């Protein structure tokens, strides 16, 4: 099967960071803390802060793509252009707790297998990895443009 990869630089950087983890206890992973600083959230004091959006913002910004700048995952629903059929590397936004909640999760689309979607993201079990989510949790897919 052939795949089209959107945002190749972003996806590649995400894969380069695969396995990056929060540090236990009082320590903070300096790379995760850099995600926050790079997008102007210098006030964040620890890697225990939800960082899925900071991760996507960071890899988008440093690779020259538009980015939300916000730490709320659902901010990505207003960034980029909505697409109905995603390519590898497109942004995927999911709901968390409930569809009507303000809470969410954001990552990069890898693929769909049956009624599940594989997502490359940060803060997935406290690390950068590929995790599986029910397709029913997807709020939308976004393609970003170079800036």
For each of these PLM feature ranges, what is it?
Residues 11, 117, 139:
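A broad, low-specificity signal marking well-ordered, structured residues that form hydrophobic/aromatic
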Residues 28-30, 72, 134:
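Helix N-terminus capping/helix-initiation residues
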Residues 1-63:
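N-terminal capping segments
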Residues 131-147:
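Intrinsically disordered, low-complexity, charged/polar segments
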């Amino acid at each position: 099967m052939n795949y089209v990869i959107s945002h190749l630089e972003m996806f590649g950087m995400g894969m380069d960071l695969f396995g990056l983890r929060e540090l236990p206890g009082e320590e903070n992973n300096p790379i995760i803390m850099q995600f926050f600083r790079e997008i102007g959230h210098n006030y964040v004091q620890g890697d225990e802060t939800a960082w899925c959006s900071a991760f996507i913002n960071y890899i988008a910004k440093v690779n020259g793509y538009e980015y939300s700048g916000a730490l709320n995952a659902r901010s990505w629903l207003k960034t980029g252009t909505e697409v109905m059929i995603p390519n590898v590397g497109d942004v995927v936004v999911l709901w968390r707790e409930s569809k009507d909640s303000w809470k969410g999760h954001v990552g990069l689309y890898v693929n769909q297998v049956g009624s599940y979607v594989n997502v490359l993201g940060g803060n997935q079990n406290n690390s950068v990895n590929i995790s599986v989510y029910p397709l029913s949790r997807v709020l939308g897919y976004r393609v970003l443009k170079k800036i």
